[in-house]
C-alpha cells in the first residue's frame, strides 16, 4: 500500500475518528494487507481485570488483524474522561514520546499498515509540553483528516487543514463522516468541502449509527 502508516485526526472531538479508523482498517484488510490500529493516548478508560481499557481503543483492536496486545495498541490509558493533559495529571502520569515511539515500532513490525488514531481535534494537546503535531513528527506520519459533516464543518475542516500545514505536516486525504442526519443541504456541503480541501477524499461514511465497521469499509476509497 502507498502509505504503510498514517495518523487519523478530526475537526473536533466526537466526530467519528474511531468510526473512520476502524473502517479504514477493514478497508486495508479487504485489499489483502495486514493492518493494526493504535490509540497512543486515550482518556475515559474503564477498569477491567486486565487494567484500564478504552472503548475506542478496543474497537481498534477488534478491527485489527493480527490483533495486537492492548498495552501496545494503547500505551497511555487514562481513567478520567478529560483532555489528556488533565487526565494524566489526575493520576500523576507524565506523557512522553519515547513509549509511544517504541509501541509504534512494535506495531509496524506486526503488520503491513498501522492506523494511528489521535485525540479530539488536531489542536488538542497531549500534555503541557506536547502537541499532536510533535507525536506525528516523531513517528514520521502523514495525516488523514476526518470531517464531521454538520453545520460549520466547512470552516472547521479548512481551519484544521490549515493548522496541519502550518505545523509542517502533510495531509494526504480526508473522509466525510455524516454525524447529523437532520443536516440540510448535505450534498452541497460535501461538494464544497471537496472544492476547498486540497487533498483527495478517501470516502464518505453515511449516517448509520449501528453499522459494523466492516460494513462501513465499503465507503472508504483508499489510494492505490
From Swiss-Prot:
Pfam family, one: AAA_26
EC identifiers of the protein: 6.3.3.3
CDD domains for this protein: DTBS
Cross-referenced InterPro entries: DTB_synth_BioD, P-loop_NTPase
UniProt GO molecular function: ATP binding; dethiobiotin synthase activity; magnesium ion binding
PANTHER family per the UniProt record, alphabetical: DETHIOBIOTIN SYNTHETASE
Subunit structure: Homodimer.
HAMAP family (UniProt xref): BioD
Binding site for ATP: 14-19, 56, 117-120, 177-178
Keyword annotations: ATP-binding, Biotin biosynthesis, Cytoplasm, Ligase, Magnesium, Metal-binding, Nucleotide-binding
Protein name per its UniProtKB record: ATP-dependent dethiobiotin synthetase BioD
Annotated localization: Cytoplasm
Taxonomy, superkingdom: Bacteria
Residues at the catalytic site: 39
Role this protein plays: Catalyzes a mechanistically unusual reaction, the ATP-dependent insertion of CO2 between the N7 and N8 nitrogen atoms of 7,8-diaminopelargonic acid (DAPA, also called 7,8-diammoniononanoate) to form a ureido ring.
Amino acids binding Mg(2+): 18, 56, 117
Family annotation (SUPFAM superfamilies): P-loop containing nucleoside triphosphate hydrolases
Pathway(s): Cofactor biosynthesis; biotin biosynthesis; biotin from 7,8-diaminononanoate: step 1/2
Enzyme class: ligase
Reaction catalysis annotation: (7R,8S)-7,8-diammoniononanoate + CO2 + ATP = (4R,5S)-dethiobiotin + ADP + phosphate + 3 H(+)
Binding site for substrate: 43
Amino acid at each position: 500500500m502507498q502509505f504503510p502508516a498514517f495518523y487519523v485526526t478530526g475537526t473536533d472531538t466526537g466526530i467519528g475518528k474511531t468510526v473512520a479508523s476502524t473502517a479504514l482498517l477493514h478497508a486495508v484488510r479487504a485489499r489483502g494487507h495486514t493492518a493494526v490500529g493504535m490509540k497512543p493516548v486515550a482518556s475515559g478508560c474503564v477498569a477491567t481485570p486486565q487494567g484500564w481499557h478504552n472503548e475506542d481503543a478496543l474497537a481498534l483492536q477488534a478491527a485489527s488483524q493480527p490483533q495486537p496486545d492492548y498495552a501496545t495498541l494503547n500505551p497511555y490509558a487514562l481513567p478520567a474522561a478529560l483532555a489528556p493533559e488533565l487526565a494524566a495529571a489526575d493520576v500523576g502520569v507524565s506523557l512522553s514520546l519515547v513509549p509511544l515511539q517504541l509501541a509504534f515500532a512494535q506495531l509496524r513490525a506486526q503488520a503491513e499498515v498501522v492506523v494511528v488514531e489521535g485525540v479530539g481535534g488536531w489542536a488538542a494537546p497531549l500534555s503541557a509540553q506536547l502537541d499532536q503535531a510533535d507525536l506525528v513528527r516523531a513517528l514520521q506520519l502523514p495525516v488523514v483528516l476526518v470531517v464531521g459533516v454538520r453545520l460549520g464543518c466547512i470552516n472547521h475542516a479548512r481551519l484544521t487543514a490549515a493548522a496541519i500545514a502550518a505545523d509542517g505536516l502533510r495531509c494526504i486525504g480526508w473522509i466525510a463522516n455524516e454525524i447529523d442526519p437532520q443536516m440540510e443541504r448535505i450534498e452541497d456541503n460535501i461538494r464544497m468541502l471537496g472544492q476547498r480541501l486540497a487533498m483527495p477524499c478517501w470516502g464518505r461514511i453515511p449516517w448509520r449509527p449501528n453499522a459494523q465497521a466492516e460494513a462501513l469499509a465499503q465507503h472508504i476509497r483508499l489510494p492505490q
